[in-house]
Amino acid sequence: MGIFDWKHWIVILVVVVLVFGTKKLKNLGTDVGESIKGFRKAMNDDEKPADPTVTPAQPVPPVQPQATAQANPPHTIDVQAQKVEEPIRKDV
């Protein structure tokens, strides 16, 4: 039997129709139907390949490492931190 009997569902349906009205329920049903149709169309579009004429990428041969360490030696910057004074506030 369950929690709701068929009589309970009839009462709930009557209350919903009285509260929202048949016109709003019809519009709501139409909107939900269009949303489901759009969702199904989008799902079908995703399953199709985007561009069947695209060829697979050719494998790139591995690049031999050059002597880049000699061409670009690391630069070391040697500085000391200096204390900066707070600016004087004009509103005080």
UniProtKB/Swiss-Prot annotation:
Residues 65-74 have a biased composition (Low complexity). Residues 43-92 are annotated as: Disordered. GO terms for biological process: protein transport by the Tat complex. The chain crosses the membrane at residues 1-21. GO terms for cellular component: TAT protein transport complex. InterPro entries: TatA/B/E, TatA/E. Its main location: membrane. It is found in: Cell inner membrane. The Tat system comprises two distinct complexes: a TatABC complex, containing multiple copies of TatA, TatB and TatC subunits, and a separate TatA complex, containing only TatA subunits. Substrates initially bind to the TatABC complex, which probably triggers association of the separate TatA complex to form the active translocon. Part of the twin-arginine translocation (Tat) system that transports large folded proteins containing a characteristic twin-arginine motif in their signal peptide across membranes. TatA could form the protein-conducting channel of the Tat system. Belongs to the TatA/E family. This is Sec-independent protein translocase protein TatA. It comes from Pseudomonas fluorescens (strain Pf0-1). The gene is tatA.
